[in-house]
Design a protein with these regions (language model features):
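Glycine-rich beta-strand-centered segment in the early N-terminal region that forms part
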Residues: 38-54, 68-115, 157-159
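Glycine- and other small-residue-rich loops at beta-strand/loop junctions that grip anionic moieties
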Residues: 145, 165, 196-200, 221-223, ...
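C-terminal hydrophobic helical "lid"/dimerization subdomain
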Residues: 4-13, 273, 323-396
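NAD(P)H dinucleotide-binding glycine-rich loop of Rossmann-like/cofactor-binding domains
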Residues: 111-194
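Glycine-rich cofactor phosphate-binding loops and adjacent beta1-alpha1 units
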Residues: 183-194, 228, 235-313
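Mid-domain Rossmann-like dinucleotide-binding core that forms the NAD(H)/NADP(H) cofactor-binding site
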Residues: 160-246
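Cytochrome P450 core scaffold surrounding the K-helix E-X-X-R motif
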Residues: 59-64
């Protein structure tokens, strides 16, 4: 495949995309590659999607930092971006659940060979080699178009089109909390009253939202002292924001009580051990942060172990999400719009217009102050300009 920008193959319609060269640090660049066709998907189940917006996050930053990521077999580059949102352009002959003009989001992980992949829960795969669009061995969504099987494409209600780019991050929360409730069926009766969220970034904010939609009292811990946008967003949900600069998580719990469920989304591994010490009896702690490095900490291991054993406590990790969680995320987002108005749109702080501005996109992701969700405005929606959708000009 010819990925050189400006070197167009004769007779092939090309498109632009943002890619990296896996294993090479700071290699993000613009490529030109053939526009995909629905015919590459068997059994008439292909769907061609025009990309409108793609969110970027720490995963994209780490891939560009050459920490992980692999190109598809036969290519020397990986199109990044796993938080895609777009509109259907064309469907195969046997696609009945989608039509041209539908807003959609595609899942990220693709099936492997394990029993979990076979039954549709590829997010629980036991395969050592896995396939994730924009992350590992499959091209992502930071391109003008993509094609996939209808099985992996989820319809988004039109009322969510302005916030649809948040659906994939929402699935991280949705899976973790759903798994926690599934685990707690061991108790026969479990009605959590108090929840804690570790971290006030995008995932922490969405976790706070999901807990509040379920009527649970929430305390969200972040490092930065309030007031700032994230703390305002948390308090607008009726939750409490606490800065760990002012009080530690264990000290807060000693003064105010333990938590029935804790969702960790801080990206700071030592706080996991603080969370373990603030979990109530029969409680469940969900870990969602992917932490590299080799940080070491000293912890009261015997006491933590004793409390977990005597308190019947559970700690579980969660990663990725299958179609089920994309569908339930859309439902929760719709409920959030009804209950909290423009709350979700306030998370979309930094739009960057155009794939050609990839350098600015990554500079914003890495350096922008006050950023919650940085995203690329890739294409236009029915002729509407891709600027000023969120109260500021794209690229600002």
């Amino acid at each position: 495949m010819d990925a050189g920008i400006g070197r167009v193959k004769i007779g092939i319609i090309n498109m632009k995309a943002i890619a990296v060269k896996p294993g090479i640090k700071d290699s993000v660049h613009l490529v030109e590659m053939p526009k995909p066709e629905i015919g590459v998907i068997p059994n008439g189940r292909g769907v061609l999607v025009k990309v409108l917006r793609v969110g970027v996050d720490g995963t994209d930053k780490e891939i560009n930092n050459a920490e992980y990521g692999a190109a598809p077999v036969g290519d020397n580059f990986l199109v990044i971006g796993h938080e895609g949102f777009g509109v259907v352009e064309e469907v195969g002959a046997n696609v009945t659940e989608l039509k041209k003009g539908d807003y959609v989001v595609a899942t990220v992980r693709r099936p492997g060979t394990s029993i979990f992949d076979i039954i549709g829960t590829n997010d629980m795969t036991t395969d050592d080699t896995y396939f994730e669009r924009g992350i590992n061995l499959r091209h992502g969504y930071l391109s003008e178009f993509y094609v996939d099987d209808a099985e992996f494409i989820v319809k988004v209600p039109r009322g969510l089109k302005d916030v649809g780019v948040l659906l994939e991050p929402m699935t991280v929360v949705q899976k973790g909390i759903t798994q926690a409730y599934e685990i707690q069926r061991r108790l026969k009766v479990w009605k959590p009253r108090r929840a804690a969220v570790m971290g006030a970034g995008t995932i922490g904010l969405l976790a706070t939202l999901v807990f509040r939609l379920r009527g649970i009292e929430v305390v969200t811990f972040g490092r930065k002292p309030k007031p700032y946008l994230n703390s305002d967003l948390i308090e607008d949900l009726g939750a409490e924001y606490i800065s760990t600069i002012n009080i530690s998580v264990p000290d807060y719990a000693k003064q105010n009580g333990a938590f029935d469920i804790i969702f960790e989304a801080s990206g700071f591994s030592p706080i996991v051990f603080d969370a373990m010490q603030t979990l109530a009896k029969n409680g469940v702690l969900v870990l969602s942060s992917v932490t590299g490095g080799d940080r070491m900490v000293e912890v009261p291991a015997d006491r933590i172990n004793l409390d977990f054993v005597l308190g019947n406590k559970v700690m579980v990790g969660t990663v990725n999400a299958n179609r089920e969680y994309f569908e339930t995320s859309a439902k929760d987002m719709a409920q959030a719009v009804l209950e909290y108005g423009d709350w979700l749109s306030r998370l979309l702080t930094h739009p960057i217009a155009g794939l050609e501005n990839h350098a600015h996109l990554f500079d914003t992701l890495i350096n922008a102050k006050g950023a919650i969700k940085v995203f690329c405005e890739v294409g236009e929606d029915a002729g509407r300009p891709t600027t000023n959708s969120y109260g500021q000009a794209s690229g600002s």
